[in-house]
UniProtKB/Swiss-Prot annotation:
SUPFAM superfamilies tied to this protein: Regulator of G-protein signaling, RGS, Transducin (heterotrimeric G protein), gamma chain, Winged helix' DNA-binding domain
Domain (RGS): residue spans on this chain: 299-414
Protein role: Inhibits signal transduction by increasing the GTPase activity of G protein alpha subunits thereby driving them into their inactive GDP-bound form. Binds to GNAT1. Involved in phototransduction; key element in the recovery phase of visual transduction.
Stated name of the protein: Regulator of G-protein signaling 9
Binding partners and assembly: Heterodimer with GNB5. Interacts with RGS7BP, leading to regulate the subcellular location of the heterodimer formed with GNB5. Component of the RGS9-1-Gbeta5 complex composed of RGS9 (RGS9-1), Gbeta5 (GNB5) and RGS9BP. Interacts with PDE6G and GNAT1.
Residue stretches making up the G protein gamma domain: 222-283
Expressed in which tissues: Isoform 1 is expressed in photoreceptor outer segments. Isoform 2 is expressed in brain striatum.
Organism listed in the record: Mus musculus (Mouse)
Changes after translation: Retinal isoform 1 is light-dependent phosphorylated at 'Ser-475'. Phosphorylation is decreased by light exposition. Interaction with RGS9BP is decreased when isoform 1 is phosphorylated at 'Ser-475'.
Length: 675
């Protein structure tokens, strides 16, 4: 079916519907349009259905607009009947969820030439009355009774058509019948909206003539066209650069007086509920504001437009014995914008007071202007004194206005003017308070910036083996601490090395990670040890930091009391991953705590802070092997994290309870050899 839009010739305000139709056509494109598929509604499978979320997403991606703008445009499309809802027909809005919608057939589009007549609506209501067995909405019952009285002469035809359409509809299958019912209901909801719903098609009366129709050229029309072009040739032409310069100058001059661009002093009364702005800028206030007085110096029209400015200018003219000029101009304005019934009376008074020979306030105008004015007063009208008013206006503008700006009257007024200070209402949550407005960035630019940022993040590969990466402390992270008893020779994988079955504690109870100066990262310790400048039996970082050394905090034991031969310096990173796996900690879930205030415990739980939660029982000191710790002993009183390495040959002795040193799992064999 072709789309007929001849009805738009008489409805210029509905011309935007053609743009909506073009967008709806793009939506129905099988390749680039909205995804449509069969959906089951109640007991019927409706074909070519779509969800509101898919429509909103398509509009956002197709037009490159924000979600709010796409939602507004989608609501317009639904309200004008191009898309109708299946599940909630009365609610003509686009829901951004899984609600089902269908495209309206072009026959029911608003741009069709045929109008929504009362006969068609009566047939629709009669058919619904037969189908629902008299159960209609209240407004539908009222319209049914009203149409029965209005077109009673052809009501038999209405009932006959309704019965025939109802019988034809029963012969269709369920899906087609359900879709056609939804289409008709959506059409009449748009064209016969129920009470309380906004009628979007209410545009007023149609034009009598077609504005797009080509008119026949007549002699009178051609003469008017010739006269128009002759007058256009007589006008003075100005270069575009001069005109643009004048516009820029005017904008710069009046920018400080623009309440929208620069705000208003002392405050905006519509925002702060403070009427001081209106009080200071009253028409005839005793002392005006400084900004108001400065505006009088912009041009003569600004002065004569302001009642307070006219009052001051009148006082100046009286001192120069020319006050009748401004009085005549005000009388002409009263005649021009006053009551029509008093035009003749006011014109006679003005003539006797200002223009008649020997008048009390006679004005000085040239003889030609006087003759034109006197002839026009024979048949007075609103604009009969325009020639004399223009003459007096130009006289005051070119002569009196310049002297007024240099007079002591204006200077004294400017000196006494009030300059109010900006006041804001603290309880107001509105952000508009004398601030320069900036236009929002385009959604297209924002989306391009987001895509570029994502591309840069994807291109940056993370190498955790490089020094300096991931070594900064993260105060918001909490690392799980577990324990692992050293395995026995008979059982290399101890049961205590299995992962705990209980879930982690609440993140709010985790202890924050300390500063790197107190307990450095094991990666940094390994990297510092790889330099080969420090023996393995010494703590290289204990002397540089303010914290106590490892040897001071470690309790004496039988193993450490025996003197052991010192091994040559060896890098910490020299231990390979295979050695770590052979020592039996493959299944260990233990992670380093890296906190000097929360030691590891043997039960594999996270130690709470302070009095939070249930206090765990204190266990006896026990030697454990931690993931990142080389040698560790459970302290009883001190909470200092033990991060040190002893002689590697200590693990080769006969004592099975001696700790075994491990390395970070990400350190490769090549790095160990290089150290």
């Amino acid at each position: 079916m072709t789309i007929r839009h001849q009805g738009q010739q008489y409805r210029p305000r509905m011309a935007f519907l053609q743009k909506i139709e073009a967008l709806v056509k793009d939506m129905q494109n099988p390749e680039t349009g909205v995804r449509m598929h069969n959906q089951r509604v109640l007991v019927t499978s409706v074909p070519h259905a779509m969800t509101g979320g898919d429509v909103l997403q398509w509009i956002t991606q197709r037009l490159w607009i924000s979600n709010l703008e796409a939602q507004n445009l989608g609501n317009f499309i639904v309200k004008y009947g191009y898309i109708y809802p299946l599940q909630d027909p009365k609610n003509l809005i686009l829901k951004p969820d899984s609600s089902l919608y269908r495209f309206q057939t072009p026959y029911f589009w608003p741009t069709q030439q045929w109008p929504a007549e009362d006969t068609d609506y009566a047939i629709y209501l009669a058919k619904r009355n037969i189908k629902k067995k008299g159960i209609l909405e209240e407004y539908e019952k009222e319209n049914y009774d009203f149409l029965n009285k209005k077109i009673n002469y052809k009501w038999d035809f209405v009932i006959m058509q309704a019965k025939e359409q109802y019988r034809t509809g029963k012969e269709r299958n369920k899906a087609d019948r359900y879709a056609l019912d939804c289409q008709e209901k959506a059409y009449w909801l748009v064209h016969r909206s129920p009470p309380g719903m906004n009628n979007v098609l209410d545009y007023g009366l149609d034009r009598v003539t077609n504005p797009n129709e080509v008119k026949k050229q007549t002699v009178t029309a051609v003469r008017k066209e010739i006269m128009y072009y002759q007058q256009a040739l007589m006008r003075s032409t100005v270069k575009s650069s001069v005109s643009l310069g004048g516009i820029v100058k005017y904008s710069e001059q009046f920018s400080s007086n623009d309440a929208i661009m620069s705000g208003c002093l002392p405050s905006n009364p519509w925002i702060t509920d403070d009427t001081q702005f209106w009080d200071l800028n009253a028409k005839l206030v005793e002392i005006p504001t400084k900004m108001r007085v400065e505006r009088w110096a912009f041009n003569f029209s600004e002065l004569i437009r302001d009642p307070k400015g006219r009052q001051s200018f009148q006082y100046f003219l009286k001192k120069e014995f020319s006050g009748e000029n401004l009085g005549f101009w005000e009388a002409c304005e009263d005649l021009k914008y006053g009551d029509q019934s008093k035009v003749k009376e006011k014109a006679e008074e003005i003539y006797k007071l200002f223009l008649a020979p020997g008048a009390r306030r006679w004005i000085n105008i040239d003889g030609k202007t006087m003759d034109i004015t006197v002839k026009g007063l024979r048949h007075p009208h609103r604009y009969v004194l325009d020639a004399a008013q223009t003459h007096i206006y130009m006289l005051m503008k070119k002569d009196s206005y310049a002297r007024y700006l240099k007079s002591p009257i204006y200077k004294e007024m400017l000196a006494k003017a009030i300059e109010p200070q900006e006041t804001t209402k603290r309880s107001s949550t509105l952000p508009f308070m004398r601030r320069h407005l900036r236009s929002s960035p385009s959604p297209v630019i924002l989306r391009q910036l987001e895509e570029e940022e994502k591309a840069r993040e994807a291109a940056n590969t993370v190498d955790i083996t490089q020094p300096g990466q991931h070594l900064a402390p993260s105060p918001h992270l909490a690392v799980y601490t577990g324990t692992c008893v050293p395995p026995s020779p008979s059982s290399p994988f101890s049961p205590s090395c299995r992962s705990p079955r209980k879930p982690f504690a609440s993140p709010s109870r985790f202890i924050r990670r300390p500063s790197i100066a107190i307990c450095p990262s094991p990666s940094r310790v390994a990297l510092e040890g790889s330099s080969g400048l420090e023996p393995k039996g010494e703590a290289s970082w204990s002397g540089a930091n303010s914290g106590p050394s490892v040897t001071e905090n470690r309790e004496p034991s039988a193993d450490h009391s025996r003197p052991q031969p010192r091994a040559p310096p060896k890098a910490r990173a020299a231990l390979s991953l295979g050695r770590f796996l052979r020592r039996g900690c493959l299944a260990s879930p233990v992670f380093a705590r890296l906190s000097p205030k929360c030691p590891s415990v043997s039960h594999g739980k996270v130690q709470p802070l302070g009095d939070m939660g249930q206090q765990l029982p204190r266990l006896k000191p026990k030697k454990v092997a931690n993931f990142f710790q080389i040698k560790m002993e459970m302290p009883t009183d001190s909470g200092t994290c033990l991060m040190d390495s002893d002689d590697p040959r200590a693990g080769e002795s006969g004592d099975q309870t001696t700790e075994k040193e491990v390395i970070c799992p990400w350190e490769s064999l090549a790095e160990g050899k290089a150290g």
